[in-house]
Amino acid sequence: MKKKGLYQIKDSDKKVKEYTLSVLTEDKAGLLNSITIIFNRRKINIDSLNVSTTEVKGVSRFTIVVSSTKEKIIKVVNHINKLIDVLGAFLYEEDEIYYQEIALYKLSTKIFLKGDLIEKIIIRKYGAKILKIEKDHTIIQKTGTKVGTQKLYDELKKFGEILEFARSGRVALSKKKRKTINFLRTLEKTKSNKLNI
């Protein structure tokens, strides 16, 4: 039986672009490995990966960002949909989702003694905030897109060395009016076994 969410390949799908996959799964150990192996076999690098719980108990959401051709990524999505503990895999382009990432920047506290210019850049221009100030370092937090967090990184680099930098994986929700629980109930009706929802 075919699951919902299977995609067809068109001739126009050969250009490399950024795609976001949202994969709903049962909360089972070992599934991360099963999913990442599919990308490895097709030589597709995962740019960002986030796994979290959903609003439905026992269901996890994998948010995976890749740069690939649509042709290749459709094959990956179709393969992921065939995994036993996968409830549904969905493919999105950037304009089809709401998404955010978080970035943390560790800077020497000394650069803040040079005046308020850096604080104006951080707070006013980039909407970042100072998370923690210690004697030897200061932590800045920025939530936004990868482009936005990278622009702040480049700007901060001009003031001195960035001691440490970390960026989270993307979290994303579809712009479509689909509720996870409704999708799972529809899926449950087509399956012989009951889902624990």
Can you describe what each PLM-predicted range is?
Residues 64-67:
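Amphipathic, charged alpha-helical scaffolds that flank and support histidine-based chemistry
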Residues 1-20, 24-59, 70-197:
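Long, contiguous binding/interaction regions
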